[in-house]
């Protein structure tokens, strides 16, 4: 079975646009490369618009990725370009992201 990764990212409202630009420039091309190589099945970054009360001054996102196996997850996380991006994004976050992953159980 595949592996699903779900992450809730939170950014200070005044840094949200900077994060989106950075993500588009540095992570999206990696996603596209990994997708073409069959190492990502699907991936998305979605602004949270409902479900929980919004935190004042914070913009939250759902990052969802599905990969064939844990090996591709680890390969992405160890990619030098991703590791160059990560500290820049972390500096904009008021707290650690919420991260979950596991073997996909059902899928359509």
Report each predicted region and the residues it spans:
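Short, well-ordered beta-strand segments in beta-rich or mixed alpha/beta enzyme
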Residues: 3-12, 43-80
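Glycine/serine-rich loop-strand microenvironments at binding/catalytic pocket rims
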Residues: 1-16, 20-23, 105
């Amino acid at each position: 079975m595949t592996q699903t990764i779900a992450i809730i990212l939170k950014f200070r409202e005044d840094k949200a646009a900077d994060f989106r630009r950075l993500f588009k420039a540095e992570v999206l091309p990696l996603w596209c490369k990994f997708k073409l190589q069959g190492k990502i099945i699907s991936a998305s970054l979605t602004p949270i618009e409902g479900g929980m009360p919004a935190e004042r001054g914070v913009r939250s996102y759902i990052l969802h990725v599905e990969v064939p196996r844990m090996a591709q997850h680890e390969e992405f996380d160890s990619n030098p370009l991703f590791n160059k991006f990560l500290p820049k994004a972390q500096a904009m976050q008021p707290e650690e992201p919420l991260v979950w992953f596991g073997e996909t159980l059902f899928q359509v």
